UniProtKB/Swiss-Prot annotation:
Region named Leucine-zipper: 555-576
Classification lineage: Eukaryota, Fungi, Dikarya, Ascomycota, Pezizomycotina
Protein purpose: DNA-dependent RNA polymerase catalyzes the transcription of DNA into RNA using the four ribonucleoside triphosphates as substrates. Specific core component of RNA polymerase III which synthesizes small RNAs, such as 5S rRNA and tRNAs.
A molecular function (GO) term: single-stranded DNA binding
Organism of this sequence: Chaetomium globosum (strain ATCC 6205 / CBS 148.51 / DSM 1962 / NBRC 6347 / NRRL 1970) (Soil fungus)
Name by which UniProt lists this protein: DNA-directed RNA polymerase III subunit RPC3
Primary location: nucleus
Gene3D superfamilies: Winged helix-like DNA-binding domain superfamily/Winged helix DNA-binding domain
Comp. bias regions, Acidic residues: 360-383
Keywords annotated in UniProt: DNA-directed RNA polymerase, Nucleus, Transcription, Zinc
Similarity remark: Belongs to the RNA polymerase beta chain family.
Any single GO BP term: DNA-templated transcription
Amino acid sequence: MTPRQVRHGLAVLQQHNLLFYHTDPGAEFASYEANPDNAYNLVRTGKILEMIDTSFGAPAKDVMQSLLLSGQTRVSDLVAAYKEKIEQGNQTESTVGDDNDFGIEANGVNGDSKADKKAGPLIKSTAHLNTIICRLVEAELIDVVHPKTFESSEDILKTVEKEVMQKHFPAGVKGNKAKVELQERIAEGLRKVRGESKSLKRKLEQNGSAAKRRKLLAGFGMANGAHDEDMDPALDPRQVIRINYEKCLVDLRNRRLVQYATDMTGETTAYVYGVLLKLLTKDLSRCRADLVMDAVGDKDEEDDKGPGSVTTDQILDNLKTSVDLSLGIGKAERGQVSSTAAEKIELYPPKKKVLIEEAEVDGEASADEDEGEDESSEESDYDSDYKASTTHGTNGVNGTNGTNGTKVKFDESAAPKERRMDRPAQLRQHLLMLAESTQHFVRHCGPNEWTVDFVPVMKSLREAELDSVIERTCGRQGLRLVRILRAKGKLDEKALPNVALMRKPELQQKMLEMQTAGFVSVQEVPRDLKADVKKSFFLWFCDMDSSLSRLLDTGYVTMVHCLQVLEALRRKERDVLETTKRTDVRGREKDTMRKSYYERYSRFLESERKLFAQVMRVDDLVSVLRDF
């Protein structure tokens, strides 16, 4: 390659943020480093666009698709491209989406191309484009490009440390207090660097445009949002923007958790959970703390209640009125429900709660009793609300639920008006179902306050994903044995048949199969110093971390294999694919191509669809194991 080609390639990779570079002061050359995270995020392009389409509408999806294709883009360049597109669309609406550089053609995949042609371009004007960008910036899905964007987290940490040492500790660090101060100043510098990408969002918040829209609009009505275009300030045309993949991962995690809740609790309860997650993660910028930049984070920022809390009224205000909250709620007699246990408040996450309980055991016995009295006094407010609503609560479920059996009898004499008045109580029932689930979807952290502890929820989801893989690989017996080992810990090989209720030959064969797959391990413990094999204990155990790590590596290998097979198919059918790129053939392949060529092209499309579907399934697994 010529130097010009190398420079051009580096520029393109930097524009898509696929490369990091760092230049030391006074140095003549820059050092480059690959950005594997953003390179992998290209696989999630379809999921991100689908998420944007569902949450913000088709115009926002079109803007995000433009940024995905063009990379880091100046606002003026994006506006100029859409101006030309809008003019072409107004002149010839019938050809909108066929010959554009930003991929609007993807919006006609679902068979609604006729509707798109009648409606014209998705972006109606530059003011409409400005509004969409502002909304995406406020949602942190788009952030600002600054000089530190092109540096890796390790280089940023080294730069901040060097600046702090030169400015505040020129004579060196001496003593414990100085070390603590050094860590605090480094953390402050890292937070300052991270906050530079949110400068545009802060300007919009100071302008108050978001608050005005929240008062006027009941959600992100992107398709009908032209009436509020004048409320947003005009963006600086010199501003360079890009997609914030970290925030996209937060929204993708919410969608995955809602899907998980749907499988465990039902659609209505999962919808309530989705609204709770949306409110809770509104100001959450990333799924996981960065190992370098957040390693010396401010301890004062850590909230005892986790990522924050949401009240019942806030959830109720954001629920659609068309959703029937009576669906998915069981019925029981008033005396069969322990309101004290159901309304239990957990102020702290599971790990912190254990430490507090251990500290209380060391004290007097009355301390636990006093705590129980305090909790019961706090729960008395819940009890009063709960009892008041139970007069209508047994009637809050429509006749479609719980009617399969003949032994249970319900009082269905409540009027529809009374059922509508019971909507807050029905919402509380869904939230309590999520809080009482074994998956720890929700934690009841205060009076009418709810939060989500993502660590135990994601641990449960990873365990469910691992169980699914074990069942497909080793069958139900293998999954049963793994769950026994998780519950019992390490078990002797001689005791395992009695616990598992299986014959020893069958058990040994199944354990060997799972050991080969990496789901279980065995440990040899000698009885004496001679370490005789015949006199040793063989303990079987299940190491979750090792199994998940091996499963993640298998996912990487599978994804790479699928992409390699796809590349081989493209080379094999190169002549057919080159024919389909011709302007006189594109869109009319069946009519213009020979039968043999068209059959080869159809087989290639089918194979490509299956391979991409497999890649997406593997990406779902990788997201749960690594990113979420």
